[in-house]
Structure formats: structure tokens, C-alpha cells
């Protein structure tokens, strides 16, 4: 907490605003109460007085602060939760009246073995209320049953069969307050039924190689879902679409519950793994093809807008605990242009290390659908231990985005965003450090220029 000057984030052009003296601060807390072996209540909160306090004092770069409370019961085959969520949006363009409050969010799940043909059944009941002080309100409830059967054939193929049935009920009002039309849905009551079946086969081949064990696993999946009236219901939790190796084989490649992918598609790909002493390699790749000619609901630029999807994959290499390299990518289906490249490299020990990261997004998603702008960024960080308690550290972030990649960008292709250099001390009960930071962008009173920070923290109090 501090008493200082708070300046407007977007002052009128050409006008110098001095700002107001005010109390500014940030609060963060969390807790957990375990009432019985099954019942517990957890909660966490993050609140700040204004949009730029966290950046101004180098506490956090988060642009959204979430507060939640959750009462839950965890059983051997069941789960029950009643939760509430609130979000404080710190983005410059955010409208406070459009920020959702999720209350209540109720979820119940129960699983059991199916006695006739085998397999596992998962039942789920879920309801959610979304409230806004100046925007669209939405209430949703659904009930679903999902059956999964996994078998290994005599030739070693892993075959998984899935069947899903779900019924949804929605109610919404003030839908016109949602700016993006495809997210609104139709006001009043709307109902939707969902059915899906899938067959997934993976065929692992395992053998010795390079003094270790390698595994090659081709994989193919077929999913079929009848046509759905997706646009009739509001879209609150299925907006941020990102095709990647983690969801290419998912039953529904939309996030959340409000949108469900319909039609018939086949997904194919493979995985590779190699384990030798101190060295581990992992790789995966996949692509899908829609057999249905019906236009897809996925926007252009998401990698799923055409019948053939983009190609997605991941590569990971580890050498003991000393070195790690991870590369996630998405390639254009037509010309293999890199639509997404994300590289993380780390070398060193827990106390002395160097990290390098690179991100390039070239998705060409239209701005009137979602705020997933193209960008390119590089970042680096290093820490060197000096004895058992002292260390020096530094980091840098550089914006590599050009106007060719993003017409709205002001970057020339190499613009530093932030650099940092410091020295720190840490033992069992005390932490302190001195940091010099230079910012190259203005956000309200988080001004560009040099900042010097001295930080002290007492740890393990009461232990």
C-alpha cells in the first residue's frame, strides 16, 4: 500500500494531466479449510485499487485479477463443487460493466463401471450464472453422460470407443450489449441436444535404439456429431480458440461448453519417444480432415476454418536436469507457413541458469471475431549464484512484431519492451534485493524510463 499520484490511462491528446494524489495498493490472499476428509472450502482473492499499480511497482504483469471461493466434496467416484468467480480487468480498453461475475458455478460428477459391455460411464450435472452490471446476463445448465471403453487388441493396438449424450438449457437477456455478434446467441430460453461418437486407435511400436528404448505410435481417430444449432446459444466460455497438439485429438476442440464441434472428421498423426541414459526426446504431430461439407463454425485463422486443418506438433528434449528445449508449432496446411512457433530453452541448475524464449503468432484472425492479434516476441533471463545466498540476475523482452505481421502495431520489428538487472539475497528467513528496470512503453503512470526498486521480505514466519 502506498500514497502516490494516479494519472489517467488515456488522457486527451495534447493535454498534460497531473493526476490525483490517492491511496494505492494491492491485496492478495488465499486459504483452505478442510472440514472432513471429503469436504473443504478454498478461496483466493487478488484486488488492486487501479489498473496500473501492479506494473508501476513491478508486482505483476497480469492484466486480469481473479477472485474465487469454492466449496467442494471429493469422493472416490464423485465430485461436487459450488463456486463463485469475479474478475478485475486491468486492460486499457476494458469496460468494467462488461466484466462477468460467475455465481453460482455448480458442478457434479459421478463415474461408475458399465456392467453390460464394459467401459466407464461419467455423469455430469453443471450450471452456471453469468452476471454483468452493464452487459449480457446468461444462465446455463446441462446434463451429460459419457461412456468410454478402452481395449488392447491381440496385435497391440490401443482402441478407445467414446459415446457422449448431453442436453443444454440456456437463458439470456440484454444480448445486444455483446459487441461481437456471433457470441450473443438468441435472447430468452434456448435448448440444445448434443450427441457424439468417436473411435480412436493408437498402435505403439517399442524397441531398442541408441542404447535406450524408443517408441513410435501412429494414431488415427474418427469423430461424428449431428448438426448443431451452436449460434442459437450464447458463447461465454468457448471464445479463445487455439489449435495445438494438446487438443487436436479432443472430442470437442472448442474450449469450454458453449460451443461444440459438429460434423464428421478424421484426425491422424503420431508420437515418438526416445529414452536413453540422461537424455529424453518426445515429439508429436497431427492434422484433421472434415468429411462434412457444411461450413465450419471456426473462424478463419484458427487453423480449423477449412476441411483440412493446419498441422500442429510439439518437440521436447531434456538432458538430465541441466538442459531442456521445447518447441510448439502450427504449420499452414497449404504452404507450410509457420502460423505459430513457440520455443523455450533453459540450461543450468536451480540457482544458476539461463532461459531463452521466442514466440511468433501469424494467425491472421479477423479483429471483429476475437482479440488474438499476431505478434512476435523474444525474451531472455539469466541468474548467477554468488555463494550460497547471493545472486545477480537480468532479463530482457523485445517486441519483434512488424506492421507486416500486425497493421495495428507501432513496432518497427525490433523494439525493446523491458530490461532488468539486479542483485538479491535469500536465506531461510530473509529475502531482499535491488533491481534496476527500464520500461520502453507508457501505461498511465507506469511511465517509460528507469525505475529502481528495493525489496525486503520476511519468510517462514511462525514456522
Place the predicted regions along the sequence by residue:
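Outer-membrane beta-barrel proteins and related beta-barrel translocases across Gram-negative bacteria
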Residues: 1-463
Amino acid at each position: 500500500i502506498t500514497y502516490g499520484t494516479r494519472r489517467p490511462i488515456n488522457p486527451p491528446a495534447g493535454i498534460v494531466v497531473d493526476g490525483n494524489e490517492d491511496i494505492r495498493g494491492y491485496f492478495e490472499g488465499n486459504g483452505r479449510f478442510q472440514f472432513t476428509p471429503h469436504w473443504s472450502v478454498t478461496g483466493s482473492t487478488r484486488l488492486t485499487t487501479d489498473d496500473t499499480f501492479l506494473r508501476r511497482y513491478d508486482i505483476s504483469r497480469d492484466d486480469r485479477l481473479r477472485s474465487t471461493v469454492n466449496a467442494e466434496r471429493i469422493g472416490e467416484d464423485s465430485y461436487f463443487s459450488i463456486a463463485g468467480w469475479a474478475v478485475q480487468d486491468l486492460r486499457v480498453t476494458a469496460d468494467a460493466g462488461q466484466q462477468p461475475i460467475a455465481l453460482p458455478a455448480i458442478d457434479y460428477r459421478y463415474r461408475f463401471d458399465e456392467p453390460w459391455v464394459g467401459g466407464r460411464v461419467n455423469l455430469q450435472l453443471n450450471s452456471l450464472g453469468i452476471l454483468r452490471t452493464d452487459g449480457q446476463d446468461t444462465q446455463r445448465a446441462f446434463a451429460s453422460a459419457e461412456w468410454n471403453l478402452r481395449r488392447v487388441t491381440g496385435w497391440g493396438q490401443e482402441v478407445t470407443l467414446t459415446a457422449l449424450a448431453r442436453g443444454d438449457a440456456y437463458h439470456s437477456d440484454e444480448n445486444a450489449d455483446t459487441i461481437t455478434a456471433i457470441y450473443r446467441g438468441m435472447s430468452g430460453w434456448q435448448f440444445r441436444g448434443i450427441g457424439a461418437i468417436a473411435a480412436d486407435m493408437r498402435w505403439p511400436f517399442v524397441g531398442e535404439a541408441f542404447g535406450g528404448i524408443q517408441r513410435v505410435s501412429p494414431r488415427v481417430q474418427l469423430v461424428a456429431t449431428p448438426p448443431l444449432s451452436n449460434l442459437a446459444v450464447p458463447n461465454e466460455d468457448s471464445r479463445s480458440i487455439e489449435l495445438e497438439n494438446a487438443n487436436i485429438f479432443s472430442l470437442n476442440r472448442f474450449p469450454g461448453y458453449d460451443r461444440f464441434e459438429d460434423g464428421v472428421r478424421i484426425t491422424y498423426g503420431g508420437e515418438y519417444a526416445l529414452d536413453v541414459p540422461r537424455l529424453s526426446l518426445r515429439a508429436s504431430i497431427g492434422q484433421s480432415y472434415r468429411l462434412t461439407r457444411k461450413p465450419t463454425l471456426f473462424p478463419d485463422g484458427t487453423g480449423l476454418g477449412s476441411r483440412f486443418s493446419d498441422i500442429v506438433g510439439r518437440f521436447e528434449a531434456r538432458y538430465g536436469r541441466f538442459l531442456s528445449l521445447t518447441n510448439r508449432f502450427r504449420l499452414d496446411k497449404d504452404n507450410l507457413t509457420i502460423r505459430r512457433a513457440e520455443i523455450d530453452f533453459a540450461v543450468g541448475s536451480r540457482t544458476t541458469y539461463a532461459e531463452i524464449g521466442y514466440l511468433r503468432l501469424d494467425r491472421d484472425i479477423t479483429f471483429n471475431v476475437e482479440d488474438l492479434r499476431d505478434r512476435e516476441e523474444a525474451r531472455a533471463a539469466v541468474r548467477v549464484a554468488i555463494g550460497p545466498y547471493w545472486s545477480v540476475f537480468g532479463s530482457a523482452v523485445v517486441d519483434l512484431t512488424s506492421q507486416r505481421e500486425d497493421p495495428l502495431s507501432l513496432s518497427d520489428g525490433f523494439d525493446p519492451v523491458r530490461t532488468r538487472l539486479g542483485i538479491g539475497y535469500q536465506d531461510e528467513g530473509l529475502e531482499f534485493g535491488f533491481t534496476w528496470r527500464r520500461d520502453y512503453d507508457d501505461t498511465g503512470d507506469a511511465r517509460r524510463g528507469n525505475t529502481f526498486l528495493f525489496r525486503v521480505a520476511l519468510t517462514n514466519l511462525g514456522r
